[in-house]
């Protein structure tokens, strides 16, 4: 609706004033499309624009948002759900649901940031028995080895590598009490994220594990950073 357009323009104008970055992340995940099926205004817009379904309605809206951002000299990033109804080649896809959506986007010519939850969600538990060892939080276990398994270029042709802008580790804070807790969830697993980004073609987990256990505790200690000790104590 025109009211929705006015809202996003006002809100994004504030974002642009605050952040001078080239890229603006507009989200696009977890849209309530079941509600859109029951929404008379949504269904009217689908009919008026000749759209096939609610996925295309989201894409229709995203195209308008992206056009507005381009008019203001910025570029759009969105979660991989924005691909479901089709998206422009200029949009940057942040692939979180799984790596293969990012691979698909890169093959189609979109730029991609790989952040699949199975490898990059650092708020996930660091042990297989979180109720015993960790504060309340997500119970899915993400080991250092599993983080390190990520290959952002898997199943891509060399000519498509340029479409991978990089990788990102995420820490969602619903269950995070303070910044020290953020550090403990991020470190040392962020070291695996960093090595994948810098040396994906020279990965060797056994060598990485030896270096990490030898160097990181002192490094973090000297910097007065909090970190999880499970990896260093071989607690899984």
Model-based region annotation:
Residues 9-22, 132-144:
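Short charge-dense sequence patches
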Residues 75-81, 86-91, 96-236:
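Flexible, acidic glycine-rich loops studded with aromatic residues
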Residues 5, 50, 54, 58, ...:
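Residue-level preference for long, well-ordered alpha-helices that form the structural scaffold
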Residues 1, 17-18, 161:
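Alpha-helix termination/capping residues and helix-transition junctions
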Residues 1-7:
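Short, small-residue-biased leader/transition segments that mark boundaries at the very start
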Residues 6, 13, 17-104:
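Gly/Pro-rich turn-and-neighbor structural signature
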